[in-house]
Amino acid sequence: MLGGEASPAPPSPAPLVGFSYSPIISTYLNRDPAVDLSTLLTKTDPDLVRLPVYWDLTQASPGTLDFTVTDQLLEVIADHNRTSSRQVRVILTIGARNFLYPELHAPSWAGPREQPELGLAQQGSDYRAYFDATLVRYRSSPLLYAWQIENEPFDYVANESTGDDQITPEQMDWEISEAHRLDPNHRAVTTTFDAWNVLLDWFQANLASVFEALRGHPSGHPAVALETGDALGLDLYVDGPSTPYRFATVALRTSWKAEAIRYWSAAASSQGKTVWLTEMQAQPWATDPGDFTANDLLVSARVYRNAPLQVVLLWGVETWLADPAWMQAATQAMGVLRTPSATPAPPR
């Protein structure tokens, strides 16, 4: 090599790619969840689909469990796999905290939607029956890729229907241990978001008191989530109402997130773990659309393809179902993320 130049690092292996789907989306829009999921599978040809097993839908009354909703969605995927060359697998999300508004999906009979009552409900026999029965029911499914335990459990998500809904560390320890006990063959991961750039992530991990004094934006709990689960799932949004520096290009903001992924991947590797991008923005923010476009989605995909990720799940299927241009962009983004070698990063 001339001038002592080092050879470039080999590109990261292509991640498994897919999307998150909730039947609540289709029900709210007066659509058929099975039809919508089938459409998404056919159009995007994913490797993975993340599905929720909602506590409130599964255990509408104490002592009664009904897995009909989840079973129907899994059957849609099984039907798809019978004729598809790419076999789709699922990540099942279980717990009181699950993805999609209002974040805490606890049944009304469980009591007030906040701590400490939430913690007491999760220690009760009914919640634990739901949790254990879900693990036992699906652990032998050939569709199962992994479990996600709770959704952003350490993060406070404020809304008008929920109070302090963070899951206690003790409860998370029990749930992860229970998943390992009842299903040692599949990983149990959990999720969070991060600060808006890697410098603040570093401060949070190493100088917490300084970070607390500096922060003005949601920070998440990536260090705690990494320590808790078998992999770290990051939910990353580059354009929304809480996004600082919206004057910067989406490509630049995405590159900041990619730097954070590399930082947390190094931390994960030291623990024998990996990082997943469990929510990659693939739609404009609903209440504050900003300027996130379908082209920005493709830019983000090219940036993230150069990051060390094992799983990437796009977020925004309700937009794709309503707009063919977004469905096409999502499909193209998955193709970019699957490229066998890293792609040139776009200009910032």
Name each region found by the language model.
Residues L2-L48, S85, H180, P184, ...:
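N-terminal carbohydrate-binding accessory modules
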Residues Y54-W55, G95-P102, Y127-G163, L313:
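Active-site groove signature of glycoside hydrolases
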Residues Q166-E170, W174-S177, R181-T287:
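Glycoside hydrolase catalytic-domain groove-lining segments
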Residues P33-S108, T162-T191, V250-K257, S300:
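Aromatic-lined substrate-binding rim segments of carbohydrate-active enzymes
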Residues P15-Y21, D47-L51, V90-I94, Y145-I149, ...:
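Hydrophobic faces of well-ordered beta-strands that scaffold small-molecule active sites
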Residues T39-T44, V69-R89, G111-I149, Q171-E178, ...:
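An active-site-proximal structural segment forming one wall of the substrate-binding cleft
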Residues R89, K273-P347:
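Substrate-binding cleft of secreted/luminal carbohydrate-active enzymes
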Residues Y54-T70, F99-Q122, D155-T162, Y245-A248, ...:
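Surface-exposed, active-site-proximal loop segments in enzymatic domains
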